[in-house]
Amino acid sequence: MLIIQLISGFTQSEKAWNGVQELREKLLSELDDYSSLSVRIRLDEWSANWRAIARQMYMLRERYPQEPLTVLVFAYSWGVGNGLVRLARQLNRFGIDIETAVISDGVYRHWFSLGNWRVILGDRRIVLPANVLSVQGFHQETSYPMGRQPLLANGKQCDPWTKIRLEHVEMDGSRDWHRRCIRVTKDAATRLVGGITSVPAAAPASAALDSRISNGSEP
C-alpha cells in the first residue's frame, strides 16, 4: 500500500486554491488507473493533528497486515518545518518510515511564535527525524523567508538540492517540484503496488473490485 501525504504551507487553507492542491489534482490524474485501496492520497494543512494522522496510517497497516506500507511526503514551507517534522516523529512511534520526502522551500517553525523571527535571519535549520529515509528538495534565494537545506538525523544529505528562480510564495506551484513529486510517485507505484489490478489482500468484497481484478480496468 502506498500513501502519499501532501502538506500545505503556513498561509494556505481550503479557502483558496493553491499549488499544493493543484499538485494533488495532477497526482490523482497520473494515478487514475490504480485502485484507491492500493494508492491513497492525503492533503492536510501544516497545523493538522499529526498524532491522529499517524495513528490512522498505523491502523491501515493493521487493517491490511499482508501489505507493506510505504509513505511518501510532499511538503511546502511550514508543511516541511512543522508538518513533515511532526508527522515523522509520530510515525516513528509506530515504527513507520517515510521512504522519500520531496520538499519545496521548507521553512523552520519555532515552537514559540515569537521565536519565528529567527527564520528571517536564517539562523535556524529544520532537522528531520531519522525515519525520513531520503529527501529531495527545491529552494529559492529571491525572497524571504528562504528555505534552507534541512539536516537529516540519519546522517544523509538532501539530494538533489535544487535552486529555483521563484519567490517563496510561488514555490508551491513550481513546475519542477510538481514534476519531481509525480516522478517519485510513479516510480514508487510501479515498484511497490504491482499493477493497476492489484488490490490489498482482505479488501472488502464488491462487484467493482471483482471487475477490476478480472478486466484489468475500472468497470
Description of each model-found segment:
Residues 31, 60-61, 91, 105, ...:
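Sec/Tat-exported extracytoplasmic proteins
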